């Protein structure tokens, strides 16, 4: 009997083992994501091969353009994962069609490459050489995609928390860059491409909507995504697309759902310094950005004591050699921390500096300081200004002695830097003032309130202006939402500069390019000649005059400059102008609408200083 039991047990075990080999075990989520990614890459490869063959056979231009647009749609599906997990390759495949440099080697010029270059080729001037030029670009893209397909053990990297971060990133990228036409500047195929992005997001999310999720959550999110796709497919015209409606009715609730689903399932990234707060449920939330990322290390992080000390120093002329000017002399709170001059008055009270005084609001949210981007940290900027012979002609070394002689300041430094020895140092002076500047955060404008759900905060004219700003007027391709400065989404780690071709004066009969060479003075890279940091447009109503040299007194004048195509329209553009050369063809009514929108960026916090 015992042997019979053993025999039956042995047979059953064998059957179970065999069944185990016959019936595959359920795939882990990362493996399912990898399978989806593989299918997307296969589809993209097919489309790339198709357009390559069309070039070989010298198809008509119209058919080549169509195949290009089809290829882009396939790319956008795969890009949800490519952009996040392969950021370096993304810059190669889909970077701007502009020569660039790296910060650590500005002398080395990197030629543009990828889809945007191919778009310029296919949609630009056409001759017999176009086919071979286009094919070379196609092969380059094809080789990179091939590397993705051949990557060994690819599934391991698709960890749940990273995939959900990729989804958040894709939503921000589509909102800030996609529907603005940033990466489809000529073809203006951005709306169909956004639909492809949403389709991919939906496919990825459905892998995670298992029995552990409530049916209500799954159905609500899927319905939102499906409706978003339908809306995009039904409103493909780039210039007429209602971005305000799309963002508030689809982007915002979908983004919230993605964040909630990830958080409820514990798909959270490890706690460390990164630009975005992963718990923030809206792209337009006042808590979207993690302030610590844009601050010094913990040792020199802002505290209330340091902010208060910095505020006193900011308005105290003790840092200047002449004792008659402070930081607040040129950065007046009632003027949104600008001075109202074309360019700042020098310390001698007779001459003027080369450049306009920028606002300090939201200075924390930029990774480059000064119009020429010559330094990264606010502390270094402060030191530069204090020691500048035209600005304050001061000395932090001397200031340490003079502040130390003040019982009031000595006590305040002891309180603010209790763990430092000594407490009063050159760096601590700079850090205290920088702590105050970092506290100047303003993200509570009428526009922000509208995007957070209060539909009473913007009227029809302002909403039309926003849609123009994001579309036909191309403003948002440089002044990125939600900050409206040059901090590039969705990573928010790089602050861009642009070459606009700004004139020396408002003279229109014989305009002359402003001689200030911008970033070039410090990098000596020809790419940076006449390049200036993209400033924020928040509170722009209060910060006239405008441009790096203060050449324009009104927003109407600024809009006229851009409407003509910048320096190109004035026939003074340098060869490396980054602003698109063509006219915007905005009507007077449309210009008024864009300006009306920009005035909604005036912040309630800033107005308290008026």
What are these regions (language model features)?
Residues 1-5:
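Positively charged n-region of N-terminal signal peptides that target proteins for export
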Residues 66, 70, 329, 428-435, ...:
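Amphipathic alpha-helical interaction segments
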Residues 551-604:
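Extracellular low-complexity, Gly/Ser/Thr-rich intrinsically disordered linkers
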């Amino acid at each position: 009997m015992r042997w019979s039991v053993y025999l039956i047990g042995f047979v059953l075990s064998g059957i179970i083992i065999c069944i185990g080999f016959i019936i595959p075990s359920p795939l882990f989520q990362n493996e399912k994501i990898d399978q989806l990614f593989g299918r997307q890459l296969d589809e993209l490869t097919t489309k790339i091969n198709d357009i390559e063959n069309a070039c070989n056979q010298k198809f008509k231009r119209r058919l080549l353009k169509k195949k290009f647009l089809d290829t882009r749609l396939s790319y956008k599906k795969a890009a949800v994962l490519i952009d996040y997990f392969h950021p370096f390759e993304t810059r190669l495949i889909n970077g701007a069609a502009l020569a660039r440099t790296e910060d650590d080697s500005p002398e080395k010029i990197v030629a543009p490459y990828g889809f945007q270059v191919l778009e310029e080729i296919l949609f630009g001037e056409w001759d017999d050489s176009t086919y071979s030029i286009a094919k070379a670009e196609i092969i380059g893209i094809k080789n990179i995609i091939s590397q993705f397909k051949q990557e060994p053990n690819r599934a391991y990297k698709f960890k749940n928390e990273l995939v959900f971060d990729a989804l958040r990133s894709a939503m921000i990228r589509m909102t800030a860059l996609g529907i603005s036409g940033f990466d489809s500047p000529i073809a203006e195929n951005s709306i169909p491409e956004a639909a492809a992005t949403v389709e991919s997001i939906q496919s990825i999310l459905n892998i995670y909507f298992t029995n552990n999720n409530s049916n209500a959550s799954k159905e609500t999110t899927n319905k939102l995504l499906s409706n978003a796709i339908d809306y995009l497919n039904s409103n493909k015209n780039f210039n007429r697309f209602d971005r305000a409606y799309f963002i508030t009715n689809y982007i915002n609730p979908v983004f919230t759902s993605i964040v909630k689903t990830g958080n409820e399932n514990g798909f959270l990234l490890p706690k460390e310094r990164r630009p975005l707060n992963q718990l923030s449920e809206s792209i337009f939330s006042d808590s979207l950005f993690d302030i610590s990322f844009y601050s010094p290390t913990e040792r020199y992080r802002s505290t209330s004591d340091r902010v208060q000390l910095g505020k006193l120093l900011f308005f105290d002329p003790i840092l200047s050699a002449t004792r008659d000017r402070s930081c607040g002399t040129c950065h007046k709170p009632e003027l949104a921390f600008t001075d109202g001059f074309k360019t700042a008055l020098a310390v001698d009270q007779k001459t003027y500096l080369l450049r306009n005084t920028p606002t300090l609001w939201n200075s924390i949210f930029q990774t480059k300081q000064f119009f020429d981007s010559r330094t990264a940290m606010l502390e270094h900027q402060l030191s530069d200004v204090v020691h500048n012979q035209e600005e304050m002609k001061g000395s932090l070394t001397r200031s340490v002695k003079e502040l130390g002689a003040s019982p009031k300041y000595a006590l305040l430094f002891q309180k603010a830097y209790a763990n430092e020895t000594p407490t009063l140092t050159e760096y601590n002076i700079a850090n205290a003032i920088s702590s105050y500047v970092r506290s100047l955060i303003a993200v509570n404008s009428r526009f922000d309130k509208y995007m957070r759900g209060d539909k009473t905060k913007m009227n029809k004219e302002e909403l039309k202006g926003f849609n123009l700003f994001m579309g036909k007027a191309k403003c948002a391709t440089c002044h990125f939402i939600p900050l409206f400065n040059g901090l590039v989404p969705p990573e928010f780690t790089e602050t861009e500069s642009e070459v606009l071709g700004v004139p020396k004066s408002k003279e229109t009969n014989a305009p002359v390019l402003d001689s200030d060479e911008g970033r070039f003075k410090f990098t000596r890279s020809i790419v940076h000649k006449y390049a200036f940091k993209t400033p924020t447009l928040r509170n722009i109503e209060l910060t006239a005059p405008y441009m790096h040299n203060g050449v324009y007194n009104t927003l109407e004048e600024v809009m006229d400059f851009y409407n003509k195509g910048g320096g190109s329209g004035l026939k003074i553009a340098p060869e490396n102008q980054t602003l698109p050369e063509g006219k915007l063809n905005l009507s007077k009514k449309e210009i008024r609408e864009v300006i009306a929108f920009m005035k909604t960026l005036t912040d309630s916090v800033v107005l308290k200083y008026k």
